[in-house]
Amino acid sequence: MSKLQSEVLKEAISQVVGESKEKGRKFTETVELQIGLKNYDPQKDKRFSGSVKLPHIPRPKMKVCMLGDAQHVEEAEKIGLDYMDVEALKKMNKNKKLVKKLAKKYHAFLASEAIIKQIPRLLGPGLNKAGKFPTLVTHQESLESKVNETKATVKFQLKKVLCMGVAVGNLSMEEKQIQQNIQMSVNFLVSLLKKNWQNVRCLYIKSTMGKPIRVF
């Protein structure tokens, strides 16, 4: 049972949207969900990580890169998706600095079957360390819908601190859509926690430049 009250959430979203309109910011702000946990020891308790696909894409401009075989490179070119082929990956020669730079440049990676197996050998553990190990794309799937699916997916990963933030929407979306995304994100996160809602200390939502508003 979700303890997130939809009225409280609805009111908070209107506040975030209203504040942004008032300030007339020049870019589309992202809406972030900030989570504080309690009764959780990252040293002892299992550090969870999980991904959930949201009903609406939170960040349409999210940068995705295809690590592709010849066929996928061709498809990526057609849809205007950034890509790297095996030769480009070989050139990186496991150089930690270059791999780190690559991981920083993109929010997420996709990879063809033939390439995904070679990633540890070609790039070392860098992408994995950054929490950006590529998602597999087969030739039976449409690359475009895989890109959209990736853009709609948010990842929760507990590291050493008991707070985290994830992008759950943007201010060009309808308030109802932002609400659906937040509800789904929160319910999924709670399902990952050992004691569910008893591990949640607080939840806030905020826009990129706005102030955080507490919803739980």
Curated annotation (Swiss-Prot):
Q: Which Gene Ontology terms of cellular component type are present? A: cytosolic large ribosomal subunit
GO terms of molecular function: RNA binding; structural constituent of ribosome
Is Lipid metabolism one of the keywords?
no
InterPro entries to which the protein is assigned, alphabetical: eL8/uL1-like, Ribosomal_uL1, Ribosomal_uL1-like, Ribosomal_uL1/biogenesis, Ribosomal_uL1_3-a/b-sand, Ribosomal_uL1_CS
Q: Does the keyword Ribosomal protein apply?
A: yes
Superkingdom assignment: Eukaryota
Q: Which UniProt keywords apply?
A: Ribonucleoprotein, Ribosomal protein
Q: Name one Pfam family in it.
A: Ribosomal_L1
BP-aspect Gene Ontology terms: translation
What the record says about family reads: Belongs to the universal ribosomal protein uL1 family.
Q: Subunit details for this protein?
A: Interacts with the GTPase NUG2.
What protein name is recorded for this chain? Large ribosomal subunit protein uL1
